Amino acid sequence: HCGMRFPSSTQPASEKIPRGRVMRIDETVPEKHYLRQNGRNDLEEQYQNHTRVVHYVSEGICTTAYALTQKGARNFLRTGGLHDSAMTVDMLLRQYCQMERGKTFHACLTVQPALFQQHHREGAKKADSNIADGGDEYRKKGVTDVVRWSLRMNWDTLLDGDTKFVDQYPDTYDPGMERR
């Protein structure tokens, strides 16, 4: 899901990727100023706080969570397992969904912001990734990016049957003002 964008006319095979979107207000989405993305932040620029958007996949990488129909799984396994087996799975999914390298159209949908994210534990940031250098920085508190009520941070609360969750991204707007 990393790098996911809304489909636009500047992307490969853009004329074949539908640009429709479904939006809904979702209290589990943090306010838009908390949303971090590399480059443009379409969510912050185009939608009000707490908006979750469902749309066709565009420019996604990483494989935190995916769901496929049985037919889609068979097609993906045929494509990835027989034809492009030297590629990483996340790049295979990207090509499969974006019709790159002569691929046919597949109805791949996603949500922004993502429903699942990696949890970064308290400690050395270099432990976060085997492909990115975290340097010597130290994280004082664990965080799950863009997930307001992180399962990892609320596990004990859930197991105890409580509903007083740790809110990583509490609302900061003035309730008397209209949400922007």
Question: What would you call each of these model-derived segments?
Answer:
Residues C2-R180:
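An acidic/histidine-cluster motif and surrounding catalytic segment
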